[in-house]
Amino acid sequence: MPKEIILPEGTPPPLAPYVPATKADNIVYVSGILPLDENNDVVHVGDAAAQTRHVLETIKHILSNAGGSLKDVTFNHIFLRDWADYPAINQVYAEYFPEERPARYCVQVGLVKPDALIEIASVAHV
């Protein structure tokens, strides 16, 4: 099965040996996306809602480069630093997935960047 590497312009360079996304058999696998700028610095420090919006906009951009959109997302893996941010994250998440929401799970973890409050990995069928 051939796979296509998705490397959209404007996304921060990976922090380790991985790519932002791969596409195989019309399925796009988006790596865990952190709220980072083009220099890999965390944006919107302390603001879970703004970080969530930034992450979802980055995923939207990646999917667009793969020929898809957020409507094609079938599963999201959500990692958050603090459960206290869960309501703010859900409020923004609901704006991006108002109907036909994808399956998901959400777990509390330590994230690779200390100021990051959220990370999302996605799977989409395009």
Curated annotation (Swiss-Prot):
<dbReference type="InterPro" id="IPR006175">
    <property type="entry name" value="YjgF/YER057c/UK114"/>
</dbReference>
<dbReference type="GO" id="GO:0005829">
    <property type="term" value="C:cytosol"/>
</dbReference>
<dbReference type="GO" id="GO:0019740">
    <property type="term" value="P:nitrogen utilization"/>
</dbReference>
<dbReference type="Pfam" id="PF01042">
    <property type="entry name" value="Ribonuc_L-PSP"/>
</dbReference>
<dbReference type="InterPro" id="IPR035959">
    <property type="entry name" value="RutC-like_sf"/>
</dbReference>
<comment type="similarity">
    <text>Belongs to the RutC family.</text>
</comment>
<dbReference type="GO" id="GO:0006212">
    <property type="term" value="P:uracil catabolic process"/>
</dbReference>
<dbReference type="GO" id="GO:0019239">
    <property type="term" value="F:deaminase activity"/>
</dbReference>
<protein>
    <recommendedName>
        <fullName>3-aminoacrylate deaminase RutC</fullName>
        <ecNumber>3.5.-.-</ecNumber>
    </recommendedName>
</protein>
<keyword id="KW-0378">Hydrolase</keyword>
<comment type="function">
    <text>Involved in pyrimidine catabolism. Catalyzes the deamination of 3-aminoacrylate to malonic semialdehyde, a reaction that can also occur spontaneously. RutC may facilitate the reaction and modulate the metabolic fitness, rather than catalyzing essential functions.</text>
</comment>
<dbReference type="InterPro" id="IPR019898">
    <property type="entry name" value="RutC"/>
</dbReference>
